[in-house]
């Protein structure tokens, strides 16, 4: 099992012709790592993926959140961040009137939403006005560490698309580390275990092939129950 390059905060990063993106800072025309994590390279970009850390919202991030409060005109949503988010009734596809918000979303409901506004004190506002954004019905919600989300999605979506195809499940990955999975119970369990494997081994090479081999093996025998908390 080959390990990706591990770097420490302040460690100089050789870009090798690629463009810096996330987790790097510039000083005197050189680039350095912001985090203790691993180097992740794509065709054009280089990122530092931290091993740990809270989710910090960014404009246009698509996240999964849980409604924790309902007022006359807006919902308060937990998006797995140090700061709660708000969503105004006008930022939904429904014709909502003040005072009847619980007819549409109540405490405990989950949504797949977009971060539409982010202010200087990290307050964020969500919107459901975009393609595929909606209230999440049925299914299971699991949690992974937010820094591992890019690895679960994979390059051009190859990892998560493979897991969906091999397990015959519907999966939505929020950039905040919450994941919605729907399908037959045994298939959902298999998808959860595969995602847990990706999270655990995110710092290694050849992971897509190993996860595929694991799924092939499990589908050929008796599936085990999930080892990841739902």
UniProtKB/Swiss-Prot annotation:
Belongs to the RRP4 family. The lineage of its organism: Archaea, Methanobacteriati, Thermoplasmatota, Thermoplasmata, Thermoplasmatales. Residues 137-195 form the KH domain. It comes from Picrophilus torridus (strain ATCC 700027 / DSM 9790 / JCM 10055 / NBRC 100828 / KAW 2/3). Residues 60-129 form the S1 motif domain. Non-catalytic component of the exosome, which is a complex involved in RNA degradation. Increases the RNA binding and the efficiency of RNA degradation. Confers strong poly(A) specificity to the exosome. PANTHER family: EXOSOME COMPLEX COMPONENT RRP4 (PTHR21321:SF4), PNAS-3 RELATED (PTHR21321). Its main location: cytoplasm. GO terms for molecular function: poly(A) binding. The keyword Plastid does not apply. This is Exosome complex component Rrp4. Keywords: Cytoplasm, Exosome, RNA-binding. Coiled coil: none annotated. InterPro entries: Exosome_RNA_bind1/RRP40/RRP4, KH_dom, KH_dom_type_1, KH_dom_type_1_sf, NA-bd_OB-fold, Rrp4, RRP4_S1.
């Amino acid at each position: 099992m080959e390990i990706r390059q591990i770097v420490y905060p302040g460690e100089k990063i050789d870009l090798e012709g690629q463009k810096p993106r996330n987790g790097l800072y510039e000083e005197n025309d050189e680039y350095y790592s912001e985090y203790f994590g691993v180097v992740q390279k794509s065709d054009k970009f280089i990122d530092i993926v931290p091993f740990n850390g809270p989710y910090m919202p960014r404009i246009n991030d698509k996240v999964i959140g849980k409604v924790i409060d309902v007022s006359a005109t807006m919902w308060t949503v937990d998006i797995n961040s140090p700061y709660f988010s708000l969503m105004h009734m006008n930022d939904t596809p429904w014709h909502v009137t003040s005072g009847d918000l619980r007819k549409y979303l109540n405490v405990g409901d989950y949504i797949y939403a977009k971060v539409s506004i982010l202010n200087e004190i990290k307050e964020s506002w969500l919107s459901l006005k975009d393609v595929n954004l909606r209230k999440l019905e049925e299914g299971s919600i699991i949690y992974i560490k937010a820094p591992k989300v890019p690895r679960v999605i994979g390059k051009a979506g190859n990892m998560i698309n493979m897991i969906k195809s091999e397990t015959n499940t519907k999966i939505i990955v929020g950039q905040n580390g919450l994941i919605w999975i729907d399908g037959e119970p045994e298939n959902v369990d298999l998808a959860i275990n595969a995602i847990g494997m990706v999270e655990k081994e995110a710092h290694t090479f050849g992971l897509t092939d190993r996860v595929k081999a694991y799924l092939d093996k499990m589908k050929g025998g008796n599936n085990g129950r999930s080892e990841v908390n739902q």
